[in-house]
């Protein structure tokens, strides 16, 4: 367990049933069975030396707890917009930094379709408010924060968005997201938007004119670009215009 973790649970400063729902969360050790690879003493020592010396970063995580009764409570849980960060689980892993992709397509606070500008700001704001009430997971804004997390036995959390649909046709929303802490954003999330074509589409039209401007802006302010759910031609265009 990482040394800086002191037992904090998400939103524990709020009163259950009044300020936050009392939905029962599933314990991490119940949701997923343990997957153990047996190591001999030499291998164990090697792993420990790597963990001690190197920085471990995950570029894609959703480090949250889900309801014990998933089918019954998931809709209410998502509507609330307060997904519970799994602090204890993070303390038991080797990650020094994680890219938190937040609620993504299940960010259905006000709309069943997801990906609404107001909703993603609520999601991000709630997560950052919770982070501000503890000191184990730190909001990562620069590379130095990752090194600090490593040295202090903490985890650096980088907020990200897997799709740019919420910015609609507003270029300055990229700057706003950066100001709130977003350091990585996808061009599309499988479906096309104002920037380009997603993987689901039968035809890939590449980056739109607005998409080219968005790529330029992201490069200017230092926001990394995710092409995981982006069409092939659109991805090639992102590379060309970066």
Task: Locate predicted features.
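N-terminal hydrophobic targeting/anchoring segments and the immediately downstream early-domain regions
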Residues: 1-187, 193-203
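Histidine/acidic residue-rich metal-binding segments in metalloenzymes
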Residues: 46, 169-183, 200-242
């Amino acid at each position: 367990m990482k040394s800086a973790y002191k037992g904090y649970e998400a939103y524990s400063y709020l009163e259950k049933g009044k300020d936050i729902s009392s939905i029962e969360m599933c314990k991490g050790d119940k949701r997923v069975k343990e997957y153990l690879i047996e190591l001999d003493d030499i291998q164990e020592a090697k792993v420990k030396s790597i963990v001690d010396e190197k920085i471990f970063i995950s570029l894609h995580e959703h480090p949250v707890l889900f309801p014990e009764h998933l089918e019954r409570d998931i809709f209410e849980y998502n509507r609330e917009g307060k997904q519970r960060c799994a602090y204890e689980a993070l303390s038991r892993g080797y990650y020094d930094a994680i890219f938190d992709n937040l609620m993504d397509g299940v960010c259905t606070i006000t709309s069943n379709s997801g990906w609404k500008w107001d909703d993603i700001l609520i999601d991000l704001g709630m997560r950052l408010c919770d982070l501000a009430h503890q000191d184990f997971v730190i909001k990562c804004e620069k590379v130095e924060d990752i090194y600090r997390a490593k040295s202090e036995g903490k985890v650096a959390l980088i907020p990200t968005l897997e799709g740019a649909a919420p910015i609609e046709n507003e270029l300055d929303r990229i700057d706003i997201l950066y100001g709130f802490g977003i350091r990585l954003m996808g061009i599309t999330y499988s479906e096309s938007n104002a920037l380009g074509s997603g993987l689901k589409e039968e035809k890939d039209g590449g980056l739109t004119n607005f998409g080219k401007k968005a790529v330029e802006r992201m490069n200017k302010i230092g926001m990394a670009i995710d092409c995981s759910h982006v069409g092939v031609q659109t991805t090639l265009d992102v590379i060309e215009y970066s």
